[in-house]
């Protein structure tokens, strides 16, 4: 396919139009008085959102060169979302400001490589200063503030703070769509996995349709059990102890299942069988987790063990187990705390090494089940459109809170970027490097300016006043007051601000050093089919 090539100024100008188109659509959402953007969906109702990365991903421009510019900035939002989970609009605003300011200087004759060096120096200094002024997050109220600012909803802030308090910082907090109008929190203590009883005849509570086992033994194996003779020796030992039994196996079927059900119905002993969670290697790892949590062993041929050799000593124990049609929850496993800690450490090490998003999610789930528990926030709303928008906001708030726990918090509302202004301005440089530093200085003002503009105020007036204020004092766009941002609970996670600045600078530097752009030439439209009007059947009379 033939290519279209543009060089230097023409190339950069074409891409800048794309940058501006995307950034202008995204930046209207910034701040407490930011507006929403409506996105058309091919199926279902349109999506209304103020989430920068969601908007950026939807934008596709007709002109190939403009589209490349737009995609570069979308990459800033996407990367910031991957690293910090929030701050995508701030990242987009910073990138646009650096690109526009940089392009003016390149057009005026500045060397792009010199500008790049200056930008990198300035961003390094800004990040060091951000780390210095960040404060560790302490207590439930701080967590609630971070989540409330991100979601623009105090109720959501309280909900997330409560969830994190209940399951710990390593706990898993998931979002589900609720059938009702209200948003509520559901916390599962202990370890839960998504496998239910093998037969409904095993239930102990017919009203709730669940089986509850108090102080049970737990047989854990990766084998399929179809012959009752295989587990008869260990069954007899459990019956002698007078305790209930939970069997976790690849499957329990045929004669073995029938015998267990008959004995359960006769009241000989209380037993529930469930399938092992997960698949393949993940199943082995999860069975090992359950064994460590309950102080039992996984009976597997890989370790030279068969079911006939199993004894009561090789079974796990727990305070209580609840089995429903779809889930099994193990509460108060009596495993050795040192072994559990070692296992948690092992999973954390795997988390740091993995590059797969899917694996990371599954490891995080396993970690939470061992370390704390799982909290589910059930998101409710009046309409499907509102539900989608609310779910996106809560997701951002959740990511924001996790980022705050990791690296602490800084003053919100773009104030922290202005607080590092003096440090960046004090860097000694000359020529194009100094110009690069000035580009970053100009960009640092942009989030505050845009928040003020979205609140219907003159951005430059707010920026100039902020330069003269003490560190931590900023403009509360929601009320129009000048306040101490940290004391007023207007905070941003340091990680979110840092990621936004780093990613914006990275893309801006790449943009400014671009000298040629290559795109596919648009294919000419195929000619329309000729009119077939003259080929009526009437003209064929002579052929009869």
Curated annotation (Swiss-Prot):
Transmembrane segments: none
Enzyme class label: isomerase
Enzyme Commission identifier(s): 5.6.1.7
Catalytic activity: ATP + H2O + a folded polypeptide = ADP + phosphate + an unfolded polypeptide
Main location: cytoplasm
Compartments in which it is found: Cytoplasm
One Pfam family cited in the UniProt record for this chain: Cpn60_TCP1
UniProt: ATP binding residues: 29-32, 86-90, 413, 476-478, 492
One GO cellular component term: cytoplasm
Family designation: Belongs to the chaperonin (HSP60) family.
Function according to Swiss-Prot or TrEMBL: Together with its co-chaperonin GroES, plays an essential role in assisting protein folding. The GroEL-GroES system forms a nano-cage that allows encapsulation of the non-native substrate proteins and provides a physical environment optimized to promote and accelerate protein folding.
Subunit structure: Forms a cylinder of 14 subunits composed of two heptameric rings stacked back-to-back. Interacts with the co-chaperonin GroES.
Descriptive protein name: Chaperonin GroEL
Source organism per UniProt: Bacillus mycoides (strain KBAB4)
């Amino acid at each position: 396919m033939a290519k279209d090539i543009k060089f230097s100024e023409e190339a950069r100008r074409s891409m800048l139009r794309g940058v501006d188109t995307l950034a202008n659509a995204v930046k209207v959402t910034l701040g407490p008085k930011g507006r929403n953007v409506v996105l058309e969906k091919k199926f279902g109702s349109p999506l209304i959102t103020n989430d920068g990365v969601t908007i950026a991903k939807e934008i596709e421009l007709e002109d190939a060169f403009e589209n490349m510019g737009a995609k570069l900035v979308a990459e800033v939002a996407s990367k910031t979302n991957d690293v910090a989970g929030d701050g995508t609009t701030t990242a987009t605003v910073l990138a646009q400001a650096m690109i526009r300011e940089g392009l003016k200087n390149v057009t005026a004759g500045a060397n792009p490589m010199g500008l790049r060096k200056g930008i990198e120096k300035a961003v390094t200094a800004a990040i060091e200063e951000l780390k210095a002024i960040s404060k560790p997050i302490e207590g439930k109220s701080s967590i609630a503030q971070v989540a409330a600012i991100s979601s623009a909803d105090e109720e959501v802030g309280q909900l997330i703070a409560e969830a994190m308090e209940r399951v710990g910082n390593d706990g898993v907090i998931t979002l589900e769509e609720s059938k009702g109008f209200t948003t509520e929190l559901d916390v599962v203590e202990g370890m839960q996995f998504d496998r239910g009883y093998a037969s409904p005849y095993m239930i102990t509570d017919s009203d709730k349709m669940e089986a509850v086992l108090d102080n049970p033994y737990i047989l854990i194996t990766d084998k399929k059990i179809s012959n009752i003779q295989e587990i008869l020796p260990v069954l007899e030992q459990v019956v002698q102890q007078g305790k209930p039994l939970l069997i976790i196996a690849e499957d329990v079927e045929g004669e073995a299942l029938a015998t267990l059900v008959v004995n359960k119905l006769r009241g000989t002993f209380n037993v529930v069988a469930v399938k092992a969670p997960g698949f393949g290697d993940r199943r082995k790892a999860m069975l090992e987790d359950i064994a460590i949590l309950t102080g039992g062993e996984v009976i597997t041929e890989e370790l030279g063990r068969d079911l006939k050799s199993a004894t009561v000593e090789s079974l796990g124990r727990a305070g209580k187990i609840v089995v429903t049609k779809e889930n099994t929850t193990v509460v108060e496993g009596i495993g050795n705390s040192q072994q559990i800690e070692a296992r948690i450490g092992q999973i954390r090490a795997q988390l740091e090494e993995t590059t797969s998003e899917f694996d990371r999610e599954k490891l995080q789930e396993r970690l939470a089940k061992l370390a704390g528990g799982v909290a589910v926030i059930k998101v409710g709303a009046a309409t499907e459109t509102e539900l989608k928008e609310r779910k996106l906001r809560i997701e951002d708030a959740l990511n924001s809170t996790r980022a705050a726990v990791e690296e602490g918090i800084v003053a919100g509302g773009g104030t922290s970027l202005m607080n590092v202004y003096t440090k960046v301005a004090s860097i000694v440089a000359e020529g194009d490097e100094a110009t690069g530093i000035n580009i970053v200085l100009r960009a640092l003002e942009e989030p505050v300016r845009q928040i003020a503009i979205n609140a219907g105020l003159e951005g430059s007036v707010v920026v100039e006043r902020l330069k003269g204020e003490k560190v931590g004092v900023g403009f509360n766009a929601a009320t129009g007051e000048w306040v101490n941002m940290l004391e007023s609970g207007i905070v941003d996670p340091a990680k979110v601000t840092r990621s936004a600045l780093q990613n914006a600078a990275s893309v801006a530097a790449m943009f400014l050093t671009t000298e040629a752009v290559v795109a596919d030439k648009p294919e000419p439209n195929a000619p329309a089919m000729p009119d077939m009007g003259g080929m009526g059947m009437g003209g064929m009379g002579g052929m009869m």
